[in-house]
From Swiss-Prot:
This is Immunoglobulin heavy variable 1-3. The gene is IGHV1-3. It comes from Homo sapiens. Residues 70-77 are annotated as: Complementarity-determining-2. Residues 20-44 are annotated as: Framework-1. GO terms for cellular component: extracellular region; immunoglobulin complex; plasma membrane.
Length: 117
């Protein structure tokens, strides 16, 4: 295990030790090229509107890749240049849920997608 993974583990362990924050994502999906996918992330254990929600992905054999984030309070968004025009991040404050929609899917979009507070 290299130092970067140790740091990530320690941060995750410290966060989990002091809270009951939970982020529950929708399940796996299979899509055809050119289609769109919308992933949900339901938050609990904290005030949803007080934090930003980030979306990252990890393709097979690749590093984590940041896609964008949303300010859950005011709805402002910022996207990675790489995904600009294809990704849309939204939120429903009444349901404490964030959404990430990726359009014009291609084979290179095969990945595990994560939300992160």
């Amino acid at each position: 295990m290299d130092w970067t993974w140790r740091i990530l583990f320690l941060v995750a362990a410290a966060t989990g030790a002091h809270s009951q924050v939970q982020l529950v994502q929708s399940g796996a999906e299979v899509k055809k090229p050119g289609a769109s996918v919308k992933v949900s992330c339901k938050a609990s254990g904290y005030t949803f509107t007080s934090y930003a929600m980030h979306w990252v992905r990890q393709a097979p054999g690749q590093r984590l890749e940041w896609m964008g984030w949303i300010n859950a309070g005011n709805g402002n968004t910022k996207y990675s240049q790489k995904f600009q025009g294809r990704v849309t991040i939204t939120r429903d404050t009444s349901a404490s849920t964030a959404y990430m929609e990726l359009s014009s899917l291609r084979s290179e979009d095969t990945a595990v997608y994560y939300c992160a507070r």
